[in-house]
Amino acid sequence: MAETHFFPLTVASISPETTDAVKIGFDIPTACRNRFRYKPGQYLTIRSKLGGESVSRSYSICSGINDPIMQVAIKRIDGGLFSNFANDTIKVGDIVDCMPPQGKFSAELANGHEKNYLFIAAGSGITPVISNIKSILEEEPKSRVTLLFGNQ
């Protein structure tokens, strides 16, 4: 059963990915590290107060499981409350509430395995695929990954 409790996380990094998307990294407190251990392809539900209202959205983790910082990519959506906040307002040092990682879009990885993986993604749907590919290539260096990607 997925945990439904939110934990305060500090924004550790922000970097533009495109003209309408940012990558946001989080500092995970030592006391929460086990709860926030993630598998490739999982997502975070992030919550913040916007205009006096609590707004939460889910975003795919785009970092690999061995990356030093957990990151999500957030694409701006016209009229999107949280996506515009993330792209325009949020800054390093801000605190947002996050649920521990959830989701099952991942393969069980094991060092020494030699498998073939095929991913098909379009647009911002690439974010969980990036996490999977990075993790596969690190954990199973003999495996082969093929990506079919389409974008406007």
Where are these regions (language model features)?
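Ferredoxin-reductase
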Residues: 2-95, 99, 115, 151-152
